[in-house]
């Protein structure tokens, strides 16, 4: 028998089937990592299941991948959630495609037992304890009775190892402590966060091309930012669960390697993008900028954004991103207005795309980026697949399920991919919306998809035992609105930490709004009047000058303004003023419940549009503007 030494522990290398993957790992053995590995390895050698507990980003799964990569042992990992059922792990019967019989498909736990593999129960405390107890014989005595199938007993083959991972219940959505009658069968190992010295040692090992002073600077920024969050100095009013750790630091280092390891401007810019930009409140941003500037020695120069498309490549400042449909990319860039806030937003998106990061676009409810969605999700020319989540949905709704064939015969069924599975197979851009409303039962199912594994395990009825992998060109976008109150659910900081958060800009400056409107409308009084009335209506609604009797204030967002513009486009006639007033009523005043308030807002609308001449050349100018745009905007 062959052996390998891991953290000074001699571990056997066992024979295994080659049909399951062995995940690579770049874990660096520091002193604390070595100690944690020993805490894991000795119970493993004794055949005792291990439960790893620790904060997001401390490397719980990385530890297992590291051990198994050295001993060449495949790992089957299943992301638990509140929707997990025993058959997801154990297996189930499915009808043959010809409808003339049934076949049994093993679940990942059954496969791990019968093949002698490692099984990782990821985020185990998201699952109800009564579900976990269905396979208690596995972690108690290393066997499983297939009650859902033939009833036979599957004994764990030599090499089988059961590992659970979980975040602490404190500070993580949907987590509850596992009862003692479950945990007593495990060797529970708490995985400590890395010390500053260990962070430096790890980063230096992984990124030897980066200067030591740069690594020390960003570690200090990360630690101070995390300390400020925990003390409530920043992020408190946001109601979001911010978190900075080694994963954030690795993102930063990857970006420096991509965009300029020795360029101080790049080093400062990426620090701002990762440690200042995610915060909503201006005072939080100011504190973070001050921290970053103090580390980098003064004010940080803002470089104007420049971009063009050539040779199937998007050149955007110092970024170069392949486009799979050059004509579509050029068309999108020509179809949407790009004032400075949008350019700054796009620069952050392109940075994350080139660095192959998952992107979380966050926005205020009245600043929904829906109107600009294709501009940042489809610029690479790859087809977009939307996965819309909501409360009450089941995992099968997005992953897939067995369904009757087109003939409708109940005895003939086939596996039908859900939108998430379909998009992975086809290599599409994946846009996951409704993250804030879906709850942990759906969101946490995507853990493997959004971390280093970049894969999704399908249920047994799919007939596929190997996880399906994201392609190189796939990008995962998440979209969520800001949390408005503590009673509103949000994503956990564990899930957030797998994404790069980018805030969609708040388009509220009158000059910016005029620039957006002047992209579609002739410059002058009309776009100026529309922008100013929009901001006035927003101000009155926010101050409750209108809607004071309502439980909820009126909301007027960028969507109202652009739909108003579209109305003028669609019904453009010689009397542009009347069309504009009608559009303003449709998208602003008609929703006002109080007749007096509605009348007053209509009076303001007519006042703001009083400068638009009743009969003018504006009609012809709008028609000419429409002809010059690449796509018809009506």
Question: Which residues make up each language-model segment?
Answer:
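AAA+ P-loop NTPase catalytic core and its hallmark functional loops
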Residues: 1-238, 243, 247, 255-262, ...
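C-terminal alpha-helical "lid" subdomain
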Residues: 250, 254-309, 562-629
């Amino acid at each position: 028998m062959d052996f390998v030494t891991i953290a000074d522990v001699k571990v056997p290398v066992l024979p295994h089937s080659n049909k399951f993957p062995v995940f690579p790992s770049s874990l660096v053995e520091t002193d604390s990592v070595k100690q944690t590995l020993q805490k894991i390895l000795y119970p493993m050698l004794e055949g005792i299941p291990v439960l790893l507990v620790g904060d997001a980003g401390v490397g719980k799964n990385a530890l297992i991948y590291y051990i198994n990569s050295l001993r060449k042992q495949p790992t089957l990992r299943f992301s638990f959630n509140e929707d997990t059922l025993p058959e997801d792990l154990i297996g189930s019967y499915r009808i043959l495609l010809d409808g003339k019989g049934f076949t049994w498909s093993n679940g990942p736990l059954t496969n791990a037992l019968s093949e002698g593999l490692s099984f990782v129960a990821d985020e185990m405390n998201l699952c109800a304890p009564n579900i976990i107890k269905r396979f208690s014989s596995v972690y108690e005595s290393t066997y499983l009775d297939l009650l859902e199938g033939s009833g036979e007993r599957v004994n764990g083959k030599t090499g089988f190892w059961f590992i659970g991972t979980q975040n602490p219940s404190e500070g993580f959505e949907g987590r509850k402590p596992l009862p003692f009658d479950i945990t007593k069968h495990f060797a529970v190992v708490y995985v400590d966060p890395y010390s500053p010295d260990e962070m430096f040692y790890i980063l230096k090992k992984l990124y030897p091309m980066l200067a030591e002073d740069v690594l020390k600077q960003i570690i200090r920024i990360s630690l101070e930012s995390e300390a400020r969050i925990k003390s409530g100095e920043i992020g408190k009013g946001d109601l979001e669960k911010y978190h900075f750790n080694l994963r954030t630091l690795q993102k930063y280092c990857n970006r420096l390697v991509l965009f300029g390891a020795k360029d101080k401007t790049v080093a400062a810019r990426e620090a701002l993008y990762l440690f200042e930009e995610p915060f909503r409140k201006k005072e939080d941003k100011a504190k973070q900028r001050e921290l970053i500037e103090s580390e980098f020695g003064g004010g940080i120069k803002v470089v104007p954004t420049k971009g063009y498309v050539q040779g199937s490549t998007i050149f955007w400042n110092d970024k170069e991103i392949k486009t799979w449909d050059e004509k579509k990319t050029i068309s999108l860039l020509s179809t949407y207005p790009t004032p400075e806030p949008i350019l700054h937003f796009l620069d952050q998106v392109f940075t994350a795309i080139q660095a192959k990061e998952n992107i979380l676009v966050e926005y205020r409810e009245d600043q929904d980026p829906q109107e600009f969605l294709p501009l940042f999700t489809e610029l690479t020319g790859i087809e977009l697949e939307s996965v819309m989540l909501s409360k009450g949905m089941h995992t099968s709704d997005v992953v897939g399920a067995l369904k009757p064939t087109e003939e409708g015969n109940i005895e003939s069924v086939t596996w039908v991919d859900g939108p998430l599975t379909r998009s992975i197979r086809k290599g599409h851009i994946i846009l996951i919306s409704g993250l804030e409303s879906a709850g942990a039962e759906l969101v946490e199912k995507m853990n493997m998809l959004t971390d280093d594994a970049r894969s999704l395990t399908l249920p047994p009825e799919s007939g596929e035992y190997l996880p399906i992998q994201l392609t190189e060109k796939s990008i995962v976008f998440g979209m969520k609105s800001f949390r408005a109150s503590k009673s509103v659910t949000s994503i956990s900081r564990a899930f957030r930490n797998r994404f790069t958060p980018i805030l969609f800009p708040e388009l509220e400056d009158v000059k910016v709004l005029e620039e957006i409107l002047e992209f579609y409308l002739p410059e002058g009084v009309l776009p100026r009047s529309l922008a100013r009335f929009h901001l006035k209506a927003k101000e009155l609604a926010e101050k409750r000058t209108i809607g004071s009797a309502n439980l909820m204030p009126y909301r007027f967002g960028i969507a109202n303004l652009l739909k108003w513009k579209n109305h003028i486009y669609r019904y453009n006639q010689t009397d542009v003023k009347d069309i504009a007033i009608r559009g303003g009523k449709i998208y602003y005043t008609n929703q006002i419940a109080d007749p007096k308030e509605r009348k007053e807002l209509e009076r303001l609308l007519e006042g703001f549009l009083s400068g638009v001449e009743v009969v003018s050349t504006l009609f012809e100018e709008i028609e000419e503007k429409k002809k010059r745009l690449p796509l018809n905007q009506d």
